[in-house]
Amino acid sequence: MHGFRPAAEPEVVHAFLRGEIDSERFGNDVRRALIDARGLELVQSPDLNSEDENRARESALAAARGWRNAELFEGFPEKVEWYHGVLQPDELERVRFIDYSYWVELSGGSRRPSDVLPTLRAGRLPRWLTKLGTSWCFEFAAQLATAEVVDDLIVMATPDLGELVLLEGHSRLTAIFVGGLQRRLTVSAYLGLSAEIEQWGCF
């Protein structure tokens, strides 16, 4: 991956919180955790050079999503090298969803966003997922159809970049592929490399 710059972990923590603050599923927990930590301004007007703010954001992410060793982050490696850049279309196509039942089933078992639309069209979803609803995939894709940029997915990878797994940004990446927008949009991302990433339960 060319053109990626080194990034600091506080950037990634902020990007994760920003990505989920308006989430239908996780937004309430994230906003509550931010308010308890210091306030929504931790995301809305961050000072990434402030150690106090960075600690507060980590505290909020821990409360909302388990950073950095529980819930979503169970088994997450301590040592991660972070980078930031733009994912090219062929790189986007290599990114898989996390190993979680919802995303596994939505993609027909492959964990690949490119398989979501064929799975939806074929009606191959289990009843429990159908009840949750899938119209959001098309609604979000329609919203992105007028966009030019999608900001800051968070992708985890082995050091050789042989395996790429999405940590944050599942709805955005799904909508990109459902809308066939992967070759039109500019998609930025944080990329985390770790020799121990395969111990993460969702990898």
How would you name each of these model-derived features?
Residues M1, I154-E163, L191-E196:
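Short, flexible beta-strand-to-coil junctions
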Residues M1-D47:
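Intrinsically disordered, low-structural-confidence terminal and linker regions
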Residues I21, R31, Q88, Y102-E105, ...:
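Short linear sequence elements within intrinsically disordered, low-complexity coil regions
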Residues D36, L40-P46, D52-Q88, E93-L167:
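Short alpha-helix boundary/capping and kink motifs at helix termini
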Residues E163-V178:
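A sequence-level detector for short glycine-anchored, His/Arg-bearing signature motifs
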Residues G179-R183:
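Active-site catalytic pocket residues across diverse enzymes, especially alpha/beta-hydrolases
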Residues A195-F203:
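Amphipathic, charge-rich alpha-helical segments that serve as recognition/docking helices
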